[in-house]
Amino acid sequence: MRIFRKETTVSTNLDAREGVPGDVFVAEHQSAGRGRLDHTWLSAKGENLTFSVVLAGADRSPAEIATLPLVVGLAVIKALGRFAPLALKWPNDVLSGGRKLAGILCERNGDNVIAGIGINVNQTSFPPKIAARATSLAAICGRSFNRDEVLSDVLESLDRWHGKWLAEGFVSLHGDLAAVDCLRGRTVCVRQVDDDAAPVSGFCGGIAKDGSLIVDGRPIYAGEAHIGG
């Protein structure tokens, strides 16, 4: 594993396009950090973790590759869940107490997949527009954390769970994901990726074995989910 560090970069996912599987690209600040659906990732310089990991697996089917954000989210939860109860919000957010602790953006790049990961570690004051929806390890636990240790723990966990995904497929992780699925059994509203598609609201049956989200018995493969109708 090689770890490349920058003080400032446009995006660690862009940096990772030059990497090979196992490479990790870390930055203190991203001038254009991105989340899913063109959302901006906001992170205080020097307090959190923003990094990208180059993963093998781009040779898998598009449907299997689409499950990788869930795999990465599970790895983050397995690494950090000892500090607080954590949950996964389909398809790519890690929550604590309903607030966002980490976000994930996976992108295919040639023969590889790039997993961009943002984790709120020591930030305790957030911009007003996200303050009610964000949290951090420090805010949860009332103490600061060594960010390099957090990074090491997450990378070790990611190596394990991504390896299991490569060897046994997404279905082998389904039970672990179901145990941390925060949407299952709730009423949800899903804004689909297709702008012409109407939002879907209904009872959430949880994450299916193919990575889709089941809402009123119907599988949804891409979108942004929120609790409530």
Put a short name on every predicted segment.
Residues 21, 58-86, 96-229:
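Long, positively charged amphipathic alpha-helical accessory segments at protein N-termini or as interdomain linkers
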Residues 34-36, 89, 147:
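Basic side chains
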